[in-house]
Amino acid sequence: MEEFQGYFELYRSPQYDFLYPLIFREYIYALAHDRGLNRSILFDNVGYDKKSSLLIIKRLISRMYQQNHFLISVNDSNQNKFLGYNKNLYSQMISEGFAVIVEIPFSLRLVSSLEETESIKSYNLRSIHSIFPFFEDKFPHLNYASDVLIPYPIHLEILVQTLRYCVKDPSSLHLLRLFLHEYYSWNTLITPQKSIFAKSNQRLFLLLYNSYVYEYESILLFLRNQSNHLRLTSSGIFFERIRFYEKIKYPVEEVLFPATLWFFKDPFIQYVSHQGKLILASKDTPLLMNKWKYYLVNFWQCHFYVWSQPGRIHLNQLSKHSFDFLGYLSSIRPNISVVRSQLLENTYLMYNAMKKLNTLFPIIPMIGSLAKVKFCNTLGHPISKSSWADSSDSDIIDRFVRIVGNISHYYSGSSKKKSLYRIKYILRLSCVKTLARKHKSTVRTFLKRLGPKLLDEFFTEEEQIFSLLFPRASSTLKRFYRGPIWYLDILCINDTVNHE
């Protein structure tokens, strides 16, 4: 952050924040390159870190300084080379550098907000799993929840307008327009699996998405504070970071809402958002939740000009329905405990029913994902991974162990572990079948020759941590412990099966 501060002050003016000149500085691309390497766990490697060099950057900057019109089109074929390199590489480099530049005012504003409020920057708040203790604490006391799909803008200019409050440099905004109009349309842009923009320029995509979500969340927070003096409990997870304090600190200005807000006076409303989905939960009646539903539709359509439909908002009773969030199927179920009480010669059994959050492992979608990448068939029967049969034994085992570890680590919060154990069994047997296929042997013969050492490789981190927390616990207790375990070091959802 100190280096950001130094770079930003070089081009800062009392009237405008001139960010555009930074696009011609070599250290910006060095920062983008270094940060891209640090985030290799989250992003797929598209070759940028392999091909980038100081020489390429110097050629790119010198080309931008020339007077001729510098256009980079993703639609050009791969045969078109620019100074000996693919045009897509230069486009990606510029967009990555531009995203780093535009992040500077956001980062500086967040730091100043934390310093003014003397807020403690907790690393644990960045974890994806940190939202589930919040669910366990709040949701058992609530009755209804709305599962909402966040709509997307119908015009690219809306994305540019969301940045105009912080990025006041017209040249930077025009450059952003160039990137957006060169990369197809927003409909392709929001599907990372098929979009070049989301695949090769993920930092810029994340920045635009975060700013868009932050914009409407700030207005919702502003309206909530205007209609009720009680403080809103707000938390949310972005792709890159959680900004608890920044949301509360900065309301959106210059917005007029003449509509009546009397029906929003609910002190028990809870709000959580992540990856294009948000959840509104309340203790009040379904009438209030339905009013929230139609208000959100009108709010998005009238004030943000985004396409939204009531069918994208589902209202469910927490005690009867589950909601899908962050890969878990969560629901509120009664947990009955029996207490024996004795008064003189009489003994009583008291049944105490308490609501508890249940987080279930999504076994059917996970089997579908494993079947798609050929670890099993559609029925969940393990098969060999034929594309890995040419690798070494250690490489094959390491790949399977890494996938099992990622799945076990993320879904350690499951209330019931049976489905998780089944997925781990599928992957273990798929590993054995892959090794047996490589050595042209049967599974039984291969297991007899290798012995139990192969299964020891799949000793998961969850079991190791449980042994450290409860060293005196019996082996039976360690083996059959099925309580949820939440890790506060998970900053992103890994693509656990995409290891081709």
Curated annotation (Swiss-Prot):
Pfam families registered for this protein in UniProt: Intron_maturas2, MatK_N
Listed name of the protein: Maturase K
Gene Ontology molecular function, alphabetical: RNA binding
Originating gene: matK
Domain of life (superkingdom): Eukaryota
A GO-annotated cellular component: chloroplast
Subcellular location: Plastid, Chloroplast
Single Gene Ontology BP annotation: tRNA processing
Protein family membership: Belongs to the intron maturase 2 family. MatK subfamily.
Summary of the function given for this chain in its UniProt record: Usually encoded in the trnK tRNA gene intron. Probably assists in splicing its own and other chloroplast group II introns.
Keywords in alphabetical order: Chloroplast, mRNA processing, Plastid, RNA-binding, tRNA processing
